[in-house]
Structures are given as structure tokens and as C-alpha cells.
């Protein structure tokens, strides 16, 4: 091949490549599957990945009250949050999220549309685990303020795939509203039988976990939250220990982790309560919720119905923890859970009360 022919071939190949890349970028920009530029106006949005789409939801939806959490908050409606606390509400979910991931969401939220109030779910399982376990699942380039990252969004095989997926889903009328996006309340059975069936009861541990075993990781996670309170003094933070079911307490008791978990919860109270713009709520200790297994589909996740009860209790302050009452609250709750009759859930009488016909 002559030099001239080679140059023509190279230029043709380069032009073809640029045209293909341009076409891909145009498709991604037009569909905008992650709502990076806008929320769709002419079609219902398609929700498929919380980590990819939360950044766009934050960028393009201002709200007075924002609920942020893991999958524990997935079945709350933003409209309910707004109705309870006043103003507009928005729910943001990062399933099995790490605190570094929540921090990315919070930073973007405060940079774009800072709300008056943030509700944040403190999941005991996530609060006490090592931050070092975080994966690379979070697309950081969608959350930063570097405009050069537009290219990473537009010229990305994942977002191109998501664009095609969104187009096909819209053809199948699979779009949802922002209020219901990522909700799965109607996909499972909320019932005591389901909760118990999904609960894998551990064997009793031969040795208990040391009381201080979870403190270092808990302190590192709490530092993320206290940094929010310091950086955003004009924002009210309503933090709450997520209401895992009573089966959670059976699990940590059998695993020998009771002392370690209570030490971590005490550290959380000591750390968070001194901040004037933080209010802390002990929903994890609320018997109205956690003992009602019909609210659950496993040992931790609760229904939208229970979520509405959580919002009402947050608003009323029914389970509020203070520097004056948290020690007594934790002591009383520890006494309650270590002496609880967990075996009743596997007793025939427990099942008969639900499944024996009333012949009276």
C-alpha cells in the first residue's frame, strides 16, 4: 500500500471512528439515562441503578426535605416525606451503601440544591462495618464538579447500554414516577412467615465478640456524619437508627455480638448528640414497629406501611434520644433484648394464633 493510500485509509478509519463515537454520544445525550442533564419531560423515567442515577436525581430535583439511606429507605415515598415535614420531599437510596458513598451524594446535594432538612438512616449493620470494604461500584465522575467528565458520561459503554435499555423499557411502558422509582414494596410479601422464612438463624457462638471490636470502624463512619453537621450548619439533620426487626437482636445475641453492638450504639449517641443541628432517634428500639413481623420481609427490611409509621415518629419525636436519656434507654433496651423470648417464634403456639380458624 502506498503512503498516499495508507493516509487516505487512516483518515477514513479515523473519520468513521469519530462518527461512531459522535453517534454514541448523541444517543446518550438524547436519552440521558442517568438524568445527568435533565429529568425526562416527555416520558416516564426508567430507573435501573441507584448509584448511577442518584447523581442526576440530585442535580435536577430540588427539595425542602431529603431522606437518604440504604435499601432500608427504598420503600419511602418522597411525597410522604414532604407531607410529614412540610414542603417538598425527595428520597435518595444507595443500597448497601458505604459512608463514603453517602458522602458523595451529600456533597453533591449540598453543592446543587441544599435542603432545609436531611433525614439519614443509620443502619446498625452499615454503621459498624469497615469503610475499607467499599467497592468501585460508585461512578465518582457523575458526582464531582468537573465538567470534563461529561465526556466520560457521553462516551461510556455502560451509559450507552443504559440508554438502549431505557429506550426499550419505555416501549414496554416500564417507566415510573420519581416518587416510586426504586421502590420494591409491591414485589415481596410483608408477613411474619416471610420474615421468619428468610431469616437464617445462626448457631450460638462459642466465644463472644469483644465489646470494643466495632468501635474503630464505627468511629470512622461517624466522622463522615459529624463532618456534615460541621460543614452545613444551616441544615437540620434528623438521624435515626433504622428499625430492624426483633430478629436482628436474636441474630446478634446468638452471634455473641450484643456487647459490641451496644458499645457502638453508645459511641454513636456520645458522638452525635452534642451537635446542635443533629437530632437522633432510636427507631431500632421501638416495639411498635420491630416486634410486628408482619411489617417485614426478612430480619431487617420493613414495608412502606412501617415507613409511614417511622416518619410519623420522627416528626413527633416519640423516639428521640438526648444526652440526658440515651444511657438509660440503651440500658433498658439491652435488658429487654437479652431476656427476650425469641424461641416463641419457632413455637407451635405462635403459629397456631395465626393459622387456627376461629370457631367461636
Identify what each model region corresponds to.
Residues 121-122, 131, 135-231, 327-360:
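Secreted/periplasmic serine-hydrolase-like ester/acetyl group-modifying domain
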Residues 46-73:
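Short extracytoplasmic
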Residues 30-51:
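Alpha-helical transmembrane signal-anchor/signal-peptide segments
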Residues 11-29:
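Hydrophobic membrane-insertion alpha-helices, especially the h-region
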Residues 193-275:
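Conserved, well-ordered alpha-helix/loop/beta-strand core segments that scaffold catalytic motifs
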Residues 48-53, 98-105, 222:
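N-terminal post-signal-peptidase region of extra-cytosolic proteins
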Residues 62, 68, 72-152:
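Membrane-embedded segments
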Residues 266-360:
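C-terminal regions of proteins
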